[in-house]
UniProtKB/Swiss-Prot annotation:
S-adenosyl-L-methionine binds at G111, I131, G132, D133, Y134, I135, L136. This is tRNA (guanine-N(1)-)-methyltransferase. Homodimer. GO terms for cellular component: cytosol. Gene3D superfamilies: 3.40.1280.10, tRNA(m1g37)methyltransferase, domain 2 (1.10.1270.20). The keyword Methyltransferase applies. It comes from Bartonella bacilliformis (strain ATCC 35685 / KC583 / Herrer 020/F12,63). Its main location: cytoplasm. Specifically methylates guanosine-37 in various tRNAs. It catalyses: guanosine(37) in tRNA + S-adenosyl-L-methionine = N(1)-methylguanosine(37) in tRNA + S-adenosyl-L-homocysteine + H(+). The gene is trmD. Its EC number is 2.1.1.228. InterPro entries: Alpha/beta_knot_MTases, tRNA_m1G_MeTrfase_C_sf, tRNA_m1G_MeTrfase_TrmD, tRNA_m1G_MTases_N, tRNA_MeTrfase_TRMD/TRM10. Belongs to the RNA methyltransferase TrmD family. It holds the Pfam family tRNA_m1G_MT.
Length: 232
């Protein structure tokens, strides 16, 4: 079954963008996933194709209109998860990516300007998702990030499934360091254990390195990992 990605945006020309290349691009060509963009301005109600208006109560910037944006959203299948990319949303993570990738598709709504009329979220039950604690010019870049995370999890996209299972976050830890030829580079050697041929020793080293990196760089993740490990 083809995974359906619907993107509601003012800039459909931004898609597929980088997703037209590499793993995601090949998967798109093979029909593993499909991409449909909906131009919000096509649903404007005036001759100027206006999609925004001044904020109620005053303030800076402009707000995307509920009537226009809802009409654009309603152009997408109603039975798919609907997501608004927003800096105030729930932080996006690998577990959320796996959950969304297991569905039949997703509708991504890309905000612009100062924000979106709150009634859009209420009327169409949009979930707000954030890709980080920073501000972007619009939701399109965030939508590309989210789609990249989803598409690579779809069956048949990654050539080596084990590769995906060993990546950062898949087991609650950051990924261990990687090495390849040459054996010595500018005086830096590949750790001897990796060339020993001792598979258990290699696995133990990688696990130890992953735990050390996570504890140092992401103590928040390490605390969760430790808590879950104690339960098992």
């Amino acid at each position: 079954m083809t995974f359906q990605a619907h993107v509601v945006t003012l800039y459909p020309e931004m898609f597929p963008g980088v997703l037209g290349h590499s793993l995601a691009g090949r998967a798109l060509e093979r029909g593993i996933w499909s991409l449909n963009t909906v131009q919000i301005r096509d649903f404007a109600l005036d001759k100027h194709h206006s999609v925004d208006d001044t904020p109620a109560g005053g303030g800076a910037g402009m707000v995307m209109r509920a009537d226009v944006l809802v009409a654009a959203i309603d152009h997408c299948p109603p039975d798919l998860p609907r997501i608004l990319l927003s800096p105030r949303g729930r932080p996006f993570n690998q577990a959320h990516a796996r959950s969304l990738a297991s569905d039949r598709g997703v509708v991504l709504v890309c905000g612009r300007f100062e924000g979106v009329d709150e009634r859009v979220l209420q009327a169409r039950k949009l979930e707000e998702i954030s890709i980080g604690d920073y501000i972007l010019s619009g939701g399109e870049t965030a939508a590309l990030v989210l789609l990249d995370a989803l598409v690579r999890l779809l069956p048949g996209v990654m050539g080596n499934q084990a590769s995906g299972e060993c990546e950062s976050f898949e087991n609650g830890l950051l990924e261990h360091p990687h090495y390849t030829r040459p054996p010595v580079f500018e005086g830096l050697e590949i750790p001897l254990v990796l060339t020993s041929g001792h598979h258990k020793a290699i696995a133990d080293w990688r696990q130890e390195q992953a735990e050390m990196l996570t504890q140092k760089r992401r103590p928040d993740l390490y605390a969760i990992y430790n808590k879950n490990r104690r339960k098992t």
